[in-house]
């Protein structure tokens, strides 16, 4: 449900672009009434006749038969446009309609020989002072490519030129087609021009929209190497291609004119979660190239006559409010909830000094002046689709981060996803969730929650996966606390619903809302800073705002891309995943036995029961993932020099040990409650043996991930009291092999788990040549190198694996003589042979 974290689509100089002069000797094109050769220039009225269909807009679009023509005014030559290409309709397996494929700034310019060029403008480098000599050096090193060339077909009174764009939009041009990586991913070959066409063009005052159908040949993906590990990025062949040899997609290209006067930038701060844009700046006095990164946000400004009021602390209405229109295709009963989700953000903007800053409106009946494709209007689009999704993108000016417009995509079937989520996380407490179909009030509440989250993205806010960590777990059961603060300070977290609340707590509202952090983030992003001259001056003021909240966890931003900070997680609640997951599992144990009764219906089969059982298992797996992230965890707290303390700190050793103890207790001890025969016998031929093993194996493999083990080695090297890699090996081994000490019979589930554990240790003796590195997000710079992962052969990993296999071999040998259960004995004998062969290969 999200958009891009950081867009670096390129950068040119910050100064205003000028129309490129024609090369010396070139002759500017002129209107000519003489007859021309086919394909050459014609008199305007000979080309544009009374039979031509014409739409006026930023480009006047003409249609002659099957040909589409752009009439481009001289006044927009050299102006910058953003081309955004999105999927409109897709074949199965190729993503969702509305997903972005390409985004590029371009400008039209006249070239020699009666040509018009479409030049890509790359925002990579800039010079802050356009009066200094260094500007020319930047220009000389950043020549923008000519992406396309068009013959001028006619000139209108020396004020505009006409070009034929039919072949360009029908073809496979990178700016308005699939991204090359997507074509490789889906094994697509050449475009099939006889099956590709322009479906429609529409032009508006600041944008032109082109809908295209493109067909590609489908190719077989390259063969994978034998025994190669699964690669989710490996090329695949789409079902449509496998069945027919071809793949057809529908795409929409938007050409949106960027503001003539760029907005003022607000420099990015890693401690507040905004999307960002940036480029490298070369300054005359600077001794190195600087990366300038700025927040993505709307241009929200007070009217000049209201500035004095705002300085006095009075709320004022913005010069131009943010307005979202509700798609007329939206079912009537859901419109009020979508509108409420938009306007839930009004209180956040009030904290920034604005009233009525964000509004939701319906398109008046019969009003043809407001179109969903007109970039002057932002919409919540409603799609009658079985896709379970919603998304909140924006189109913004890469020069400044100013958001131009947004179209939130809302798929009808997201309601199915919401039903599943809320049932699994809330039905133990909320009786309204204990049925196949929710009533309108409950579904409306769910729609409002998701709408508010997506609107947050369109305002520039990223996911704050660290927000829910601000709430102590026991406060999630405190009705008075929840009524005041909610269960998370940010609706931008994936905290979903309060799954910790127990039936006896009397909690009635399990939903998140626009919270303390959200209001603060909007204040940081949108409150005007008066009486400063530059973004750098403004940054110093903003820094003081951040410092004033730096020690309050309610205001903390935890990035959504950090792979090792357990405070920043998706789908979790509370400040302790072990305790929160214990409560969550209690509720899953209440829900599972009741699913059959909640979903029974006359003449219906058990498909819905099967679906919801899998949802229960999926929620349980999430809890295991939340806890696992504590092991080898590293806290990352972005700071500036004014703040005390370290940026990077290992997760406390006690919490890591608690995490492994939790896994031993809730997962590695067979979760019998998941194996309810009254449910399983209705939906599966087996008894859940393989399903349990899969969850256990996935978690065990994650625990012994090379990057995680390397972090444990690193933290112990700095602090001997840290939770060590040897502690992990010991705690897992003693938990999984507890029967060696208790002398109890080992059941099927535990035998499988013990084999998985032994095989994992054996695999560690022969690591791959290059262990995968974990992702690393450095909040102060972009493009940082991955966190280091040592060559396992040159670290303690193999040594510890060998040592613990020796210990395990000794323990099994000691237990075998007193093992009376036949299958337990066979199992131990088998594992003993495997270990011996691994340790003493012949």
Placement of each model-derived feature along the sequence:
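The catalytic-center signature of Zn2+-dependent metalloproteases
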Residues: 39, 362-383, 445-452, 456-502
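Auxiliary tRNA-acceptor-end handling modules of aminoacyl-tRNA synthetases
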Residues: 14-68, 72-330, 348, 363-418, ...
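Sec/Tat signal peptide C-region and signal peptidase I cleavage site
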Residues: 8-12
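Conserved catalytic/binding loops enriched for acidic/polar residues
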Residues: 468-842
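Sec-exported extracytoplasmic/periplasmic mature domains
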Residues: 343-354, 456-457, 461, 497, ...
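Zn2+-dependent metallopeptidase catalytic core
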Residues: 77, 331-357
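Solvent-exposed, polar/charged alpha-helical surfaces in well-ordered, non-transmembrane soluble domains
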Residues: 42, 336-343, 347, 449, ...
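Bacterial N-terminal signal peptides
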Residues: 1-7
């Amino acid at each position: 449900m999200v958009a891009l974290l950081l867009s670096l689509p390129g950068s040119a100089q910050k100064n205003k672009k000028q129309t490129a002069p024609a090369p010396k000797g070139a002759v500017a094109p002129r209107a000519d009434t003489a007859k021309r050769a086919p394909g050459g220039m014609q008199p305007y009225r000979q080309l544009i006749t009374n039979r031509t269909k014409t739409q006026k807009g930023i480009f006047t679009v003409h249609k002659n038969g099957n040909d589409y023509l752009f009439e481009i005014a001289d006044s927009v030559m050299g102006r910058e446009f953003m081309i955004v290409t999105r999927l409109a309709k897709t074949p199965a397996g190729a993503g969702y309609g509305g997903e972005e494929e390409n985004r590029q700034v371009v400008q039209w310019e006249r070239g020699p020989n009666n040509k018009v060029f479409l030049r890509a403008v790359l925002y990579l480098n800039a010079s802050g002072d356009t009066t200094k000599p260094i500007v020319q050096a930047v220009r000389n090193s950043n020549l923008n490519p000519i992406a396309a060339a068009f013959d001028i077909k006619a000139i209108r009174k020396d004020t505009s030129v006409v070009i034929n764009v039919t072949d360009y939009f029908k073809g496979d041009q990178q700016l308005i087609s699939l991204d090359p990586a997507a074509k490789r991913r889906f094994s697509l070959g050449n475009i099939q021009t006889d099956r590709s066409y322009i479906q429609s063009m529409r032009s508006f005052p600041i944008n032109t929209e082109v809908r295209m159908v493109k067909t590609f040949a489908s190719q077989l993906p390259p063969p994978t190497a034998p025994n190669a590990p699964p690669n989710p990025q490996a090329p695949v062949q789409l079902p449509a291609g496998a069945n027919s040899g071809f793949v057809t997609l529908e795409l929409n290209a938007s050409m949106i004119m960027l503001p003539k006067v760029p907005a003022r930038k607000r420099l990015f701060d890693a401690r507040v979660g905004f999307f960002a844009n940036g480029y490298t700046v070369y300054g005359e006095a600077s001794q190195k190239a600087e990366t300038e990164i700025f927040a993505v946000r709307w241009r929200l400004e007070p009217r000049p006559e209201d500035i004095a009021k705002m300085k006095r602390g009075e709320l004022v209405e913005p010069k131009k409010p943010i307005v979202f229109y509700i798609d007329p295709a939206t079912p009537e009963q859901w419109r009020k909830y979508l509108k409420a989700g938009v306007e839930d953000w009004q209180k956040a903007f009030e904290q920034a000094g604005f009233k009525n800053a964000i509004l939701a409106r319906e398109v008046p009946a019969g009003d043809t002046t407001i179109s969903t494709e007109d970039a002057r209007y932002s919409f919540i689009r409603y799609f009658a689709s079985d896709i379970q999704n919603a998304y909140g993108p924006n189109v913004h000016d890469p020069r400044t981060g100013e958001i131009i417009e947004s179209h939130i995509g809302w798929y009808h079937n997201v309601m199915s996803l919401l039903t599943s989520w809320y049932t699994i996380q809330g039905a133990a407490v909320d009786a309204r969730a204990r049925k196949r179909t929710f009533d309108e009030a409950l579904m409306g509440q769910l729609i409002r929650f998701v709408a508010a989250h997506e609107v947050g993205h369109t305002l520039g806010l990223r996911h704050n996966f660290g927000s829910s960590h601000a709430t102590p777990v026991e406060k999630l059961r405190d009705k008075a606390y929840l009524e005041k603060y909610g269960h998370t300070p940010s609706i931008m977290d994936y905290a979903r619903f309060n799954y910790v609340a127990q039936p006896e707590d009397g909690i009635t509202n399990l939903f998140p809302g626009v919270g303390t952090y959200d209001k603060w983030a909007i204040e940081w992003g949108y409150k005007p800073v008066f009486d400063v001259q530059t973004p750098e001056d403004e940054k110093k003021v903003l820094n003081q705002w951040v410092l004033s909240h730096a020690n309050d966890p309610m205001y903390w931003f935890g990035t959504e891309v950090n792979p090792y900070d357990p405070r920043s997680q998706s789908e979790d609640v509370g400040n302790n995943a072990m305790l929160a997951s214990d409560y969550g599992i209690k509720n899953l144990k209440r829900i599972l036995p009741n699913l059959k009764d909640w979903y029974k219906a006359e003449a219906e089969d058990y498909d819905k029961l099967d679906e919801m059982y899998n949802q229960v298992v999926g929620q349980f797996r999430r809890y295991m993932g939340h806890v696992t992230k504590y092991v080898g965890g590293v806290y990352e707290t972005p700071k500036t020099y004014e703040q005390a303390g370290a940026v990077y700190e290992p997760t406390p050793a006690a919490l890591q040990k608690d995490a492994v103890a939790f896994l031993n207790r809730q997962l590695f001890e067979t979760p019998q409650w998941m194996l309810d025969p009254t449910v399983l016998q209705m939906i599966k031929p087996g008894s859940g043996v393989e399903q349990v093993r899969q969850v256990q194996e996935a978690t065990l493999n994650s625990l012994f991930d090379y990057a995680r083990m390397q972090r444990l080695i690193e933290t112990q090297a700095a602090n001997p009291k840290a939770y060590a890699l040897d502690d992990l090996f010991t705690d897992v081994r003693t938990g999984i092999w507890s029967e060696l000490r208790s002398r109890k019979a080992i059941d099927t589930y535990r035998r499988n788990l013990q084999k998985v554990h032994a095989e994992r240790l054996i695999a560690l003796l022969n690591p791959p040549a290059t262990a995968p590195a974990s992702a690393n997000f450095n909040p102060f710079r972009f493009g940082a190198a991955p966190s280091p992962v040592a060559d396992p052969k040159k670290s303690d990993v193999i040594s510890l694996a060998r040592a613990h296999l020796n210990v395990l071999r000794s323990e099994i040998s000691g237990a075998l003589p007193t093992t009376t259960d036949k299958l337990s004995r066979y199992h131990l004998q088998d594992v003993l042979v495997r270990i011996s062969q691994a340790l003493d290969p012949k």
